[in-house]
Amino acid sequence: MALATGLSPAMFIDLERDAWRALRAATPLPLKSEDIDGLRGLGEHLDLDEVVDVYLPLSRLLNLQVAAAQRLWAEQQAFLGGSTQKVPYIIAIAGSVAVGKSTTARILQALLKRWPDHPRVELVTTDGFLFPNDVLTERDLMKRKGFPESYDRRALVRFLAELKAGRAEVAAPVYSHLVYDVVPGEAQVVRQPDILILEGLNVLQAGAQEGKQMPATFLSDFFDFSIYVDAHEHDIRRWYVNRFLKLQQTAFRDERSYFRRFSELNHEQAIQLAESVWGEINGPNLAQNIAPTRSRARLILLKGPDHKVKRVRLRKL
């Protein structure tokens, strides 16, 4: 099977699921069915087979990568006479709305923290770095929420820089999907983890210029490994609509929900609205800003129509 548009065969090793599964070797499965139930995203397929076939080999690869980074750090410590501080290994996970990147992040967190060499694994989403709704409204960006310009990029860069500088505590803002806004006064405090997983739509995007005198800092400057969760656009669109319909029957009915008004729509109206949101916001964002970053990832998980990973593409060293 040919690589996707924009991916050079010279850059990536392309593995079918069976070949990837064999790379698990003797890696044990530390999760039970009930653990996986708590990690599954709304409307997503996730079972023990998916964890064993896809995510155990990935956790093994990441453990090797982290171990190599730790050995390099130890060598640098010896070279410098013990004058540098160990810093978190940062894994970025990118992909479209509804593609399953949040589930991927939660699974990897659960697996990686069970490896003895790096038990402290934190997960942070970039949702908290969205500008608050009042700022987005003032800038006429509410319909561009999720696009690069809707994020406080400077705050996100500062967060990552402080982590890599070895700060004892670094705070990330908290986002509520229920109220569809950043929560004032709340923060997720990250305290020198062994690994930090950063999950978000546009984490692999190249930074815009902050003026004409010097290039901006890229988020990827801080990443040790990056993953792109991929699927065909028509599948992601269908998953998004199905997720919207499930949310309409559950979370949207909460009186605190920003989308409470949508809970009263009939089935056809809900589908029409979800299709409209995809066509006007999520689809263009995927095409213009998210999918073009795929080639920057170290590893790509390609899903089939059933949400199962069919192929894995690993960038050559």
Curated annotation (Swiss-Prot):
InterPro entries: P-loop_NTPase, PanK, PRK/URK. Keywords: ATP-binding, Coenzyme A biosynthesis, Cytoplasm, Kinase, Nucleotide-binding, Transferase. ATP binds at G95, S96, V97, A98, V99, G100, K101, S102. It is found in: Cytoplasm. SUPFAM superfamilies: P-loop containing nucleoside triphosphate hydrolases. Pfam families: PRK. The keyword Nucleotide-binding applies. It comes from the Bacteria. One of its GO terms (molecular function) is pantothenate kinase activity. The keyword Ribosomal protein does not apply. Pathway: Cofactor biosynthesis; coenzyme A biosynthesis; CoA from (R)-pantothenate: step 1/5. One of its GO terms (cellular component) is cytoplasm. Belongs to the prokaryotic pantothenate kinase family. PANTHER family: URIDINE KINASE (PTHR10285). HAMAP family: Pantothen_kinase_1. This is Pantothenate kinase. It comes from Myxococcus xanthus (strain DK1622).
